[in-house]
A protein has these predicted regions:
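Non-catalytic DNA-recognition/assembly elements of restriction-modification systems
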Residues: 1-20, 154-187
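Sequence-specific dsDNA recognition surfaces
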Residues: 5-26, 40-73
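Structured loops at beta-to-helix junctions and adjacent beta-edge loops in soluble globular domains
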Residues: 11, 37-40, 108, 156
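A generic structural signal for short beta-strands and their flanking turns/coil linkers
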Residues: 33, 51, 99-101
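A short beta-sheet element
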Residues: 38-39, 57-125, 137
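A short glycine-rich beta-alpha junction/loop motif
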Residues: 95-103, 134-165
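Well-ordered mid-protein domain cores that form the structural environment of catalytic cofactors
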Residues: 121, 130-131, 154
């Protein structure tokens, strides 16, 4: 199997940082609307639904590229570094607003978003992702979107990516099922 070494910039069609913190103030939150992501939603490989705060559709519209959609990949650049998830096609919402501590990418036709996320959960992927981390004060990735785009990764053919993702998804779903069973037993 032949892998091609490509920069992230060659694998994505869009990258966008979260809004400035002052763009989402406490008074912007409402009881229902467009969910705003936080670190607890970025635990694991797939976006975790729940524990959302919401903004109105108008507020989300005003935040433009800080809106993430199904198929997008969301990465934490400040706080709990190393978090990276994809938003599945069957997510509960059509769109989400990323926080000021996150950025999002839209993959192009050369890579599956699931493959990209699984890659960055490997030891080498985490090393590459965290290589520009600053530990002074709040942990952060220096120039997050710029440095992320310069990372080089090994990319197989799309056919092989599909095979890898299919196998890893089977394991991920089995683990989720087992965890749900364990949670029910503990209750």
């Amino acid at each position: 199997m032949k892998f091609e070494t490509l920069k992230i910039a060659d694998l994505i069609s869009e990258i966008s940082m979260g809004p400035f913190g002052s763009n989402i103030k406490v008074e912007c939150f409402v009881d229902d609307g467009i969910p705003v992501l936080n670190g607890s939603n970025l635990d694991g490989f797939v976006l975790k639904e729940g524990s959302f705060r919401y903004v109105t559709e108008e507020k989300a519209d005003s935040l433009g590229k800080a809106n993430a959609h199904r198929g997008d990949v969301v990465i934490t650049h400040r706080g709990t570094l190393g978090q990276i998830v994809f938003i599945p096609q069957d997510s509960n919402y059509d769109r989400y607003v990323i926080s000021q501590s996150q950025f999002r990418v839209k993959c192009n036709e050369k890579i599956l978003p699931e493959y990209l996320v699984y890659y960055f959960h490997t030891r080498i992927g985490q090393h590459k992702l965290l290589s520009n981390a600053s530990q002074v004060g709040v942990p952060a990735l220096a120039r997050a979107s710029t440095t992320f785009q310069k990372i080089e990764i090994e990319v197989p053919t799309l056919e092989y990516q599909h095979k890898i993702v299919d196998i890893l998804e089977l394991f991920r779903k089995k683990i989720e099922t087992n965890n749900a069973i364990n949670d029910n037993l503990a209750a």
